[in-house]
A protein has these predicted regions:
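Low-complexity, acidic/polar, glycine-enriched regions of mature
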Residues: 1-181
């Protein structure tokens, strides 16, 4: 079994949510870590773990980012990280998988199923073995205590409950250190 570590320079942990029902706001986490224990070309026996620092959330708008970090949403002061740990992985064929796991946000843990597409393995310019993945899914933010909501004068919802997850990840194979005598 090999260990693969997320390459933070070549990974994006993103999300999209409807704003005012008519447009979409995108954001991402910039500080995170994760690993895969197993074979990236056959995830069915792999174990995947991941964490992200809530304080690293960014949507390109400082005021909105501050609101997301507040107790109205993620409450970063009391819940500084979100985490994911896989519990089951099923192959769908054509390098596609359904990865089920436990997602924890604000001390609330719920099962989530993600769609994972394995992009392949290559050696990079530095001789490292790298695996690529595209991961998508959806959560209902209300289920994790991200419950702030408002309604416009016309009765429109300001922030939708469903949040799309979009992750493009590269993982680097960890080289085993030789035992010293």
């Amino acid at each position: 079994m090999s260990t693969w570590i997320i390459d933070t320079a070549h990974t994006e942990i993103g999300f999209k949510v409807k704003h005012l029902v008519i447009s979409t706001v995108s954001g991402k986490f910039t500080k995170f870590e994760g690993k895969l224990e197993g074979d990236p070309a056959d995830l069915t026996n792999a174990q995947i773990t991941f964490t992200a620092d809530i304080d690293s959330i960014t949507t390109g708008n400082e005021q909105r980012d501050g609101h997301l970090k507040s107790a109205d949403f993620f409450d970063a002061a009391n819940h500084p990280k979100l985490s994911f740990k896989s519990t089951a992985i099923v192959g769908k064929g054509d390098n596609e998988y359904k990865v089920t796991g436990d997602l924890t946000i604000r001390n609330t843990t719920k099962p989530i199923t993600l769609n994972v597409e394995f992009g392949g393995v290559q050696n990079d310019l530095y001789g490292q073995t790298v695996a690529g993945f595209e991961i998508t899914g959806k959560i209902n933010r209300q289920e994790y205590g991200l419950s702030w909501s408002a309604v416009t004068e016309a009765g429109g919802i300001v922030v939708a409950d469903d949040v799309k997850l979009i992750i493009n990840a590269e993982l680097v194979k960890k080289v085993k250190e030789a035992a010293t005598a």
